[in-house]
Structures are given as structure tokens and as C-alpha cells.
Amino acid sequence: MKNIISCTKGYFLEEIKERLNALGYQLSYQILNAKDYGVPQNRERAFIVGASRFSFDFNLLEPSQSVNIQDAISDLAYLCSNEGAFESDYLNPIQSNYQALMRKDSPKLYNHQATNHSQAALEKLKLINKEQGKECLPKNLHGKQQFKSTWGRLNWNKISPTIDTRFDTPSNGTNSHPELHRSITPREAARIQSFSDNYIFYGNKTSVCKQIGNAVPPLLALALGKAILKSLRK
């Protein structure tokens, strides 16, 4: 979570620092955004690194080239509501360096299954234009959601907002496909989180959504791990 550094006037951070300092660890902390490390998503999280033999410097992390939604998912099969399978073949060629990275070592495509949306949800989605959301709906169809971002479509040329555990629900936020009348699939969400295609998610739909939505993006974790390794070798 991002606000652990500042919430309750820094109480929780101070508790962590005191306890780890007592064990001989030096602490470094910073808020990192996954978009700076090759992840097609605006995702800010607080990271705390404790080390006993060195002081870690977050400036050692190396930023990566920006990746957008088109780079991330345009090669995945265009599914309608309730289409797809747990395991399938790739139907389209690789269209970006990011897709090549995601497909590496994966002979099959997994978890590319679209939610079975209700007819009411499908009718709403049909009213929503590219790059827009709830503002396209008549006020009587807005529902109880207060946030402006609900029923939003992802933009091919931009990064995604933060993926959460309810990305399978169009009314939850900006997590509908840029063109198709459905929310993103678990595999599309996993791509946006930077999980490679050979990482397979098991369990029911709720469990899979939690596994993906609560995760630290692997490419961000990789950048942090490389920076820690640099510190160890100094």
C-alpha cells in the first residue's frame, strides 16, 4: 500500500523502523510507480528495504521504456463476453517487444477467458465509446457508483490505471477492453501487471482476480532485485 509511509502521521513506518533497527537492519523506503519500470500501468506502492550489511539506495533502480495498452495486449484473441478457454493457442502474431517478452517460453496461452456479463451490463457497454466511460450512459443507468472512472474503457495509447481485484467487473472502474464489450480477461490483466504468459493462475474466478490484482508487478520486482544485487556487490 502506498500510504503506509504517511498514514497515522508515520506511526506504522516508525514502528517498522524501530523494530528492524533493533535487529541490526538499516531501512530505506520509497514510493515506486510500476509505470517507470516497463509495466503498462500506473501503480504506486511503498517499498521498504532492510539490510544489515549496507544501506540501500533506491536511485540504483534503472527505469525502463514506457509501455502502453496496445503494446501489452493487442496480440491476444478478441473475445466476446463468456468466450475463451483456460488453455488456448496463440491466434495472432507478436506485435511489440513487450509481447515477445511476455510470450517467451510459453507454448500456449492460459487464463484468457472473458467474464459472462449480464445482458444489462452488455447493453451498457455497447453505449460506451472508445476512451470513455460512465459519461456515455444516460443518468438513469449510472447506478450507485460514485466514481467518474466506472464503466471506463482502457485507452490503446495509454497505460492502465491501477489493476485491482475486481478488474472483471466493468462497473468497478476503467477496466473494460478498449473496443470490445467486456471487461479485461485474467490474462489481459496479468499482461498489464507484467506477468509472463507461462505464469498460470489456478483457482476460481475470485481467487484468480485476487492473485493478479494484489500482486507486485514482476518487472518492478525484477528492477528492485537487480538494484539490491548491485548494492550487495559494492
Regions found by a protein language model. Name each.
Residues 1-141:
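Class I S-adenosyl-L-methionine
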Residues 96-234:
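C-terminal target-recognition/interaction regions appended to catalytic cores
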